């Protein structure tokens, strides 16, 4: 049996690559991808926010296309729109001929007075940013927001009565708190807990970035564990990890920012305890505002398995904004998967691009976008995401983890078994030689003739050497030497 040296070198190389990549992750927090952020300019910088314009046109360029202003939620950094150059929202929109802008609220714990910000401060900031973008571009703005950022979009549009807003695009943004609370909690219990937290906890404390990250991950622990197992399983294969490394680092650490206590308290009081997004009468700097003042078109992107912005709650915009044409785009994704990841790259952002172009009169309506309709009592799940969907989604993910782990363990066991067999076979053949070599010292006499005779006796018909196209056996060579 021929000894395959790769059966030894491959496991060693894999172990070395795992150690090298693991050390880099421990030292730098992740693998170095070499990717850079998309080019952008800071058009406006004030204490409350910085306004970014991505891929700003050069001097003399009159029009960069339809304008989209993107709003991030309080707990997540504005870089969520540009996690990767190829798969980030700003890059995809830019390639579709759209002019992307981003409002960046920054990290409140690193700014003077940042932890004293209120919800109204964020809404007013978005309104001010709209004024700046409209003044520079001269265009109506398509206002896009993810999760709580989408709630800011609704509230800002209501505050402005849709002035200079071409459309609103939201991703997993809840409106009707009573329709479906996260994790299926009863509305009454949720309201009581929210009121207690607003009055006795967040009036005194804020949420640090690490706590926001941990809370988000615990909403889907199975998926979190699966992601970490997949990362560890592929730690030896740098090329396989690099395409998703920026997204992994963003969710693992870089993407989270602190929440100011007053803003959380105001959010809980107005939109969870009193459900003001639906009933109306929420206040922005002591001014009463209602979503019924929204008159521009609305596109709500709904995640079928989103356990934070649940479908029933997201669809509350239909009742809250009766004067608006409300559309929905239903997609099989969880909360973060609506805007980042392979599903977002392949489905969400191409559809959003086509929506913007359709509202600008430059394209047809996206085929997957439909008018939102009022669900009948039998169709509307007051618990949000149906239990069957949650169980199926969880079992599917758990099964995938188990199968992957079993397959990996099986492959590792098979490789180990093969290596052990190869080593055992080779040991039987080579150990006697190694033992004999170990007996050789500097004073040991060695006879080449004797070695040839032993080899001829052991394998007389074995190939000793090849000369002039002819094989000479050990027996023939030994006989010729002896004569």
Predicted regions and their residues:
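Short beta-strand/loop motif that positions the catalytic acidic residue
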Residues: 294, 300-302, 306
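Catalytic histidine-centered segment of alpha/beta-hydrolase-like enzymes
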Residues: 328, 333-347
